[in-house]
Amino acid sequence: YTFLAFMAVASHTRCQFTAPGVVPAACTPPTRPNIQCDDKDEEEQLNIYYGKLHSRYTHHRTGTIKPRTSHYCHEVDAVVIKMDHYCPWVNNVVALFTQKYFLLFVFYTCLTCILCAITLGGRFLSCYRANARSKYSGWNTSQKKAEWCSPDKTDTVVTICNVVEALIFGIFTIAMGCDQAEAIAENTNYIDRLQKKRGEQQTLLQSMQDVWGEPFGWRWFFPLAPTKEHRVTFQRFCKETWVQLAMFEPRVKRAFLHDVQ
């Protein structure tokens, strides 16, 4: 129990104080090109298309680029990559760099609740059987067993509160774990699912490696900082978005115009 509780607290602490993956304020879109064409209709269409492109990959409040799977969070007033939701339990955003710690926090909290329920349930069952034997068979329980099965009022109240908390938080963490498992399996965060969007198709193992930031190993079960893979993913998302905006140049305008039509 002590180990599980320690791991839950450690995971919660790492999740609370880890930067979730905020797009830096300096990561602004490239300067908008001055589009001039002989054909006014073509120029107007290009400006409209670039406006849509700019609104898709930049955020109007922060002025920064907005990579795919990223969303604006009012709590931190920034664009966060692979944002799932803001969790008041950890006072942080569950996103690219914090989802691993959030999942570990939920996992170890759930195990702690299950262990509490099993331990207290076992105590109740053991005492029930002992009292039944003593009542119907004349079998005398030991003094230690009798004291354990006849708690005082304080012990009774604490036990009842423990059982209630274990059931409530156990059910809550199981539900949260199922929701996160669905998000990982579909490679789609919570906000994107609300917007009817779907992430890239990939295997479950690939999705889990994206969340944990490294291939499967013993480090998955501990709130340790992942390898460089998470940082590479963060930089790749930002670079892809910047390139999408920077590639809009006169030399490729006809290709974009063809896409618009």
Residue ranges and their predicted role:
Residues 1-261:
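Membrane-associated feature with strongest affinity for ZDHHC
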